[in-house]
Amino acid sequence: MPRKNNRNSYNYRNIERDVRDIQRAGKRFKKSWINADGPLERILILLVVVAVIGVTIGMLLPKVNPTVGEITGEYTATGTAAETLEKLTVDDNPSKAGYDRDAFGFRETDDDGNGCYVREDVLARDLTDVQYKNGRSCQVASGTLDDPYTGQTIQFVRGVKTSSAVQIDHVVALENAWQSGANTWDHAKLYQFGNDMYNLLAVDGPANQQKGSASAAYWLPTNSEYRCDYVARQIGVKDKYGLTVTLQEKRAMLSVLHGCPAQELPES
């Protein structure tokens, strides 16, 4: 949550007092106006009252403004996530022409050389109580997922009908990456992105399907406590690979970061 700024804090009693001052000024104006002898005196009275009300309102607005700012998101997020977001290029004319998911080679590389595809590495990293197939294989047979997207606990059991309960999500979706600049990459960089564990999470299968290729402008985790981390990771991925954001996407990210202004980028 954003830290409160004492300099911008205000007191309802002070506001009520200022409002009463305006009301009293209005009553004095009405009485003086009735008792005024001529047009010139009435004009002078009007100018004085307008000046008094203007000064009072001027003193009142700064006290109210912080709450308005919090409601509209005018205060500034200052963590590394927000700072990095400001550096990303905005492109409101992305093209998904030529998009091919297979071009990213997901699950076809073994970058760490442990003999396991990246899906198994992500499951082993993100699940707890992990059991491996045959006790020795790198294939995860079962485990428990504390799902970041829904906040639910999911039991993973490998099987034709059960494996899909836990899926591996590209936090920045492959299609979104393609539209954001990946369409210019060579084969090696596409494979690097498609299998980068920094951009991969084990998550609830239905939530992953619901998200599809949506950016933060169109989809956020239902688990509100994870949204700051989710957006920060998307920003980190886009910064790492020089990808762009749309203006609507950027605004959605900033809206989330206003609830956690000191949010840092994930390191791994």
Features from the language model and the residues they span:
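N-terminal targeting leaders characterized by basic, low-complexity, disordered sequences
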Residues: M1-K30
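Hydrophobic membrane-insertion alpha-helices, especially the h-region
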Residues: R42-P62
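N-terminal Sec-pathway targeting helices
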Residues: K27-V49
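Cell wall/extracellular polymer interaction/catalysis modules
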Residues: G69-P148, Q152-T153, G159
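Domain-level detector of nuclease and nuclease-like folds
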Residues: V140, Y149-S268
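Non-membrane alpha-helical secondary structure
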Residues: N11-N14, D21, G73, A77-T80, ...
